[in-house]
């Protein structure tokens, strides 16, 4: 009945009446996502009628009402077939300021029309294969990039920027050709990186270092939404970059990684928005060539070095807050390097473990990222080793028992999801420099058996990658417990593949020097 009344007014009424009836329809169906099939034909005709109104000279408020209803109706895939034509798509492109390259964005009164047109295009392109084909024919991706360039550094049009980015994300998600076009022809990587710089108000202090104001205000909701959409679009553009990239691209990837480091060190308007922002940053960092991730850590500034030199003992006993701050800062510094971003990633990983669900989607990206960073960058590995696998003092409880990060990761080594189990074990193995005896020390043989069997290391040894050598750091507690622990380690294999008998292992053990190959 609503569609029939609205259709009658749209066909015969004047602009004021059309605006009123469509506003009523929009208010009533704002949260409608499932539609009655009996009224399908009426909704198709209403869409056609709305497009006929949009080509006329009607007030801006009437255009907005038309577009709001069109956005609601475009949630129904079935009605889009007859209305998704090249002519109708061009109408929406014109209203979204995507039709002519020289259109300006000076008329603030037009902004609601632009935003609603972009929202309609997002729904229509996502739900209609015909619209997707027309998007390629009309070169929609190039038009969206052009609109983004007009929006650059214009904070008062964040809504336009946000839905432009969302439409770019949808297009690049659905078409691999558009990903390639965005990456190479349209220079999407630097363009989208600049959008992030603008959203975060980044001030560069060095080529790949930005100023971080830890006491500054959080991002606004609009800036956060823009940043999230830009991160998602960048993910699609760079999805294969970790496999193939030119040396000339390294600078741009390092700039992007530096922007993502800044992203990890700021917060959104709410805790949930901050987690969503950081989650998308983690996903994008996974696409960055690992050789370019060195910018996630940076040398301490002179001010930070001076602050680091001040010990806790030098602070007055009544300065509890200052002591807490100094202690916090000291845990984020390693070998003269600022490790704040890595510390944030580690905390993010632990929060995802504590959630206890959706490990494959929520946990594996950050675990994979930390694993690759640790494998490629020594300072990152050593810092994470200190945080995750500190010197072993608790030798009475099983490795999987407890609430430390190590305990949580060891429990994941026997998770039912094969992917989760493998990446958790791989992360710990890399932190142990791929040494079997070191891994067994921290995880126990039963927990590590799956990884060792897959790598053919049940008899001991080490992985294929090379790591630096350092001094022994076994604790006295571990050294005292180690003779007992040796009896639980694998007894070795004979040439025929059978396990060495216990008696033979005991006789061999009596002449083996007590050593430890765990070094950092």
From Swiss-Prot:
Keyword Translocase: no
Domain of life: Eukaryota
Localization: Cytoplasm, Cell cortex
Tissue: Predominantly expressed in the mature olfactory sensory neurons and also in a few regions in the brain.
Consequences of knocking out this gene: Death during early embryonic development. Conditional deletion in olfactory sensory neurons leads to death on the day after birth in the majority of the cases: surviving mice do not express GNAL (G(olf)-alpha) and are anosmic due to a strong reduction of mature olfactory sensory neurons, resulting in difficulty in suckling.
Listed Gene3D superfamilies: Leucine-rich Repeat Variant
Protein name (record): Chaperone Ric-8B
Organism listed in the record: Mus musculus (Mouse)
